[in-house]
């Protein structure tokens, strides 16, 4: 996620035998230690982004706005198709050319290096909505959305980071390269080039180019952050009513198909992250399917219809994939 880096991980995990079992939802009392540099940085980014939004309606060239829209989608795909579904969950495999594309897209998103993002996300699934979860939604919307990046990590997060197996990630030279050269590589791709390109090719002003880059950046940040916050607090739970993650329609467009969060936490290894596959606006699944078609993505993992139906009947909240109620006695829960 965005800058709150503490090198807690090693490539090989330590034993969990001496650690207390955490049960969600959990939010034990704690003292928050604000990281003021992060607070000021996030504040500047958002103020600059709001000014960029103003410039879109007053002086920015249309080409600059179109470029920002395109780069925003690429940045989100760098998280959803790259750090999330490919590397964190290994829900499919990718050839080197596709991994290079995804690491460039991921750098556009600048939510720390992909390695840090993957570690935090694996912790999020292993200790979801407990004090071992870096963005514990049990602490409320603001904390899970961005507050966790503005304070020092919970002691449980620091302890349990050492239990996360990252050996597959550290054996990937593409991911190691991005982490090793994070400041120049990510800085160039996320901020410098998107500012220079409009100035060079169509004569945009520095102020317009920079502030619209900030707008694009904070929009992509908050789009992904909604999965941590809104999709853990609001929505319906067709697959498991006993967990916080929910199917949340408000995050549908912004997150390119990451809104089926109840499904994802039940079947995290499904590359579609949704029972609906690439139907509708699950653009991440469409992206992966395209590269599977040309042979750059392969070994795509999916949950079987039988497993999905069985889980819905056993632990679901009585809604179907669209959020409508169905009869638990019915043999057909999916339409």
From Swiss-Prot:
A motif (Histidine box-3) lies at residues 261-265. It is found in: Membrane. Its cofactor is Fe cation. InterPro entries: Acyl-CoA_DS (IPR015876), FA_desaturase_dom (IPR005804), FADS-1_CS (IPR001522). The chain crosses the membrane at residues 39-59, 64-84, 98-118, 182-202, 213-235. Its EC number is 1.14.19.5. GO terms for biological process: fatty acid metabolic process; pheromone biosynthetic process; unsaturated fatty acid biosynthetic process. CDD domains: Delta9-FADS-like (cd03505). Keywords: Fatty acid biosynthesis, Fatty acid metabolism, Iron, Lipid biosynthesis, Lipid metabolism, Membrane, Metal-binding, Oxidoreductase, Transmembrane, Transmembrane helix. GO terms for molecular function: acyl-CoA 11-(Z)-desaturase activity; iron ion binding; stearoyl-CoA 9-desaturase activity. It is a multi-pass membrane protein. It catalyses: an 11,12-saturated fatty acyl-CoA + 2 Fe(II)-[cytochrome b5] + O2 + 2 H(+) = an (11Z)-Delta(11)-fatty acyl-CoA + 2 Fe(III)-[cytochrome b5] + 2 H2O. Residues 321-335 have a biased composition (Polar residues). Detected in pheromone gland. One of its GO terms (cellular component) is endoplasmic reticulum membrane. Residues 312-335 are annotated as: Disordered. A motif (Histidine box-1) lies at residues 84-89. It comes from the Eukaryota. The keyword Cell membrane does not apply. A motif (Histidine box-2) lies at residues 121-125. The histidine box domains may contain the active site and/or be involved in metal ion binding. Catalyzes the formation of Delta(11) fatty acyl precursors in the pheromone gland, with a preference for myristic acid. Belongs to the fatty acid desaturase type 1 family. This is Acyl-CoA Delta(11) desaturase. It comes from Choristoneura rosaceana (Oblique banded leafroller). The lineage of its organism: Eukaryota, Metazoa, Ecdysozoa, Arthropoda, Hexapoda.
């Amino acid at each position: 996620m965005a800058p709150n880096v503490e090198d807690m991980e090693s490539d090989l995990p330590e034993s969990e035998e001496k650690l207390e079992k955490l049960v969600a939802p959990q939010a034990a009392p704690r003292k928050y230690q604000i990281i003021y540099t992060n607070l000021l940085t996030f504040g500047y980014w958002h103020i600059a982004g709001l000014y960029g939004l103003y410039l879109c309606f007053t002086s920015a060239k249309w080409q600059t706005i179109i470029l920002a829209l395109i780069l925003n989608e690429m940045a989100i795909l760098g998280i959803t198709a790259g750090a999330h579904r490919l590397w964190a969950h290994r829900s499919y495999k990718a050839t080197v050319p596709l991994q290079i594309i995804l690491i460039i897209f991921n750098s556009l998103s600048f939510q720390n290096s992909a390695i840090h993002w993957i570690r935090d996300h694996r912790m999020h699934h292993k200790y979801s909505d407990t004090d071992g979860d870096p963005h514990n939604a049990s602490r409320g919307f603001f904390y899970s959305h961005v507050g966790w990046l503005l304070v020092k990590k919970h002691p449980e997060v620091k302890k349990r980071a050492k239990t996360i197996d990252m050996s597959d990630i550290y054996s990937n030279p593409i991911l190691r390269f991005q982490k090793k050269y994070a400041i120049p590589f990510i800085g160039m791709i996320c901020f410098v080039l998107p500012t220079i390109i409009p100035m060079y090719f169509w004569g945009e002003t520095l102020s317009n180019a920079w502030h619209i880059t900030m707008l694009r950046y904070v929009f992509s940040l908050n789009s992904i952050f909604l999965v941590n916050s809104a999709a853990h607090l609001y929505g319906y739970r067709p697959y498991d009513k006993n967990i916080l993650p929910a199917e949340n329609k408000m995050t549908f467009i912004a997150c390119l198909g990451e809104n089926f969060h109840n499904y994802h936490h039940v079947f995290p290894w499904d590359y579609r992250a949704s029972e609906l596959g690439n139907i509708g606006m699950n653009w991440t699944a469409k992206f992966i399917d395209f590269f599977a078609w040309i042979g750059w993505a392969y070994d795509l993992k999916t949950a079987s219809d039988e497993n999905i139906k069985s889980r819905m009947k056993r632990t679901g909240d009585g809604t179907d994939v669209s959020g409508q109620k169905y009869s638990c006695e019915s043999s057909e829960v999916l339409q």
